[in-house]
Design a protein with these regions (language model features):
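Juxtamembrane and targeting peptides
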Residues: 39-141
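Core segments of small alpha/beta cavity-forming domains
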Residues: 109-186
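Hydrophobic membrane-insertion alpha-helices, especially the h-region
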Residues: 28-40
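Structured, amphipathic secondary-structure segments that form assembly/contact surfaces
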Residues: 1-6, 155-247, 255-281
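Short, solvent-exposed mixed-charge patches
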Residues: 285-287
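Terminal targeting segments of Actinobacterial cell-envelope proteins
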Residues: 1-23
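Conserved aromatic-histidine-acidic binding/catalytic patches
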Residues: 18, 27, 31, 130
Length: 287
């Protein structure tokens, strides 16, 4: 599932508005790749709501590690919570929207990959879990949460996922950017008059924005999004979340912690020079 890919670069995707594409479909009476590109971009923009952004900036990513804060099993308090909020809100590198479109992969050394641990059991809402109490474990858990929610193509499933995996004070079924993204995608496909929809959400790159103590991590995952109706459109979508370690009878699990969603990360086509320059590293699966 994970790993660096070296493939022939697809042709550039036209940057048309969703309204323009839908007008074209009405006039032509066909459902083509152009609509699919619009659907993919719809998800991309839905994952960038106003509450999910904390400012601009450009260039390299602002990775940060803080040694304060503690509290497995709670949302944190005092200076620890302040440090978590500051880390989550810290702006990340910003790129042009076109960076999310398929592009030529880099020939430069990508650096050491991030090895994601394997799940050891299935958790609430059918989400793989059992990841270790490490930054890599937090990243693997975030990837699993997003994959199950988005690939389901079901708002009911997405609601259940975030309800089961977010702590009180965190994203809800009504506010989570993942639910908003899926709702936008489903709205467009219903407008197109088809129920034949397949979504593949593959984590290919990632970075750890920072940590606060051993129990709080802000991992960021850069996914390849493939949306198929009659043809397939592809794009990149990135997500960062506050991941907080919670102990339980089975040892513990990473959950989405309380507070506003972190500043928006760069959604960059994986393995490009730009993806590497903003701090992303390839993801590989532990053997």
């Amino acid at each position: 599932m994970f790993g660096r890919r070296r493939e022939k670069a697809p042709r550039p995707v036209p940057q048309w508005t969703r309204e323009k594409m839908l007008a074209l479909l009405v006039g032509a009476g066909v459902l083509g790749l152009v609509l699919l590109v619009g659907v993919g971009l719809c998800v991309y923009y839905a994952l960038r709501p106003a509450h999910h952004s904390a400012g601009g900036g450009n260039g390299t990513t602002t990775s940060s590690t803080t040694g304060t804060g503690s509290g497995s099993g709670d949302g944190g308090s005092g200076s620890g919570q302040d440090a978590r909020d500051a880390l989550a809100a810290k702006p990340m590198a910003q790129v042009d929207d076109a960076a999310s479109h398929p592009s030529a992969v880099s020939t430069s050394p990508p650096g050491a990959p991030i090895v994601l641990p394997a799940a050891t059991r299935v958790g609430p809402a059918g989400v793989p879990t059992g990841y270790p109490h490490t930054s890599e474990g937090a990243m693997a858990q975030l990837a699993a949460i997003d994959q199950v929610a988005l690939q389901s193509g079901s708002l009911g499933t997405a609601h259940e996922v975030i309800t089961q995996w977010a702590m009180p004070g965190g994203p809800t079924a009504g506010t989570w950017s993942g639910v908003q993204a899926l709702a936008s995608l489903l709205t467009d496909t219903q407008t197109a008059g088809t129920a034949q929809l397949a979504i593949v959400f593959t984590p290919l790159m990632g970075q750890v924005k920072g940590t606060v103590g051993p129990d709080f991590v802000v991992p960021c995952v850069d996914f390849e999004l493939d949306v198929t109706l009659t043809q397939t459109a592809r794009g990149a979508v990135a997500d960062c979340q506050r991941m907080l370690w919670q102990t339980d009878a089975k040892g513990g699990r990473w959950m989405v912690g309380p507070g506003a969603e972190p500043a928006t990360p760069a959604s960059v086509w994986p393995d490009t020079d730009l993806a590497i320059s903003v701090g992303y590293r390839d993801l590989t699966k532990a053997s």
